[in-house]
Amino acid sequence: MADHDEQSRTAQRQADKWLIAGSLLIGSAVLGIIGLPIFLRGVWLLRRAQRDGLSVRPMMVTLIGYLVVIDAAINAMGWSLDLIGNHSLLARVLLTGWGNMFDAGYFWHFNELWVGGAGGPGEKAWEVALILTVFTMRIAAGIGFLQMKRWGQQWMIVTCWMGVLIWCVYVFNMTMFADVRYAGVIFPVIGWWLYDIFYITPFLAIPYLHTVNREIFTD
């Protein structure tokens, strides 16, 4: 029994090393292509440990936890770049390129406001509010969830419902100012849905979070 527990802990640590490294790279947004195969290697190691009968973290908990952390990190990094580093070469290339292809709010009057960065209506309010609240809360909740803590599971529920609210309000914002956000871009509404579809992850996680056996999480 002790040998089984030790093998399980070793397998979990080995998988988490790859998963954490991949998540950090993907969460940086710029290095996401490098991070994805590293992350998938961690998923494969965890899957192999489960097939070998070892007691490791459930795959669904692992995927939801890491993907929530990655989602929050990508948004926090991208918006922080626009909020703080908007005059950097990286921002002026990536953000205006994004604006030219998908969302003209990141191209229209870029760096002409007193704050700098995106000039899309309401965008700066979203950036300040969500970086300081929801994204940091979701990263903390994801870490607690991956550690199988009950507070992590509870805060995952709270922040996922907040994600639903954010998604709905952001859709309204993009619709209300469609004449600014979609004017002259290469991929207008269709392009926006292509990348925005990934933001429905809170919708997908909520049923599991409400129905999972809470006894698997510890105080």
Predicted regions and their residues:
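Topology signature of small-to-medium multi-pass alpha-helical membrane proteins
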Residues: 2-16, 27-219
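Membrane-interface alpha helices of multi-pass inner-membrane proteins
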Residues: 21-27
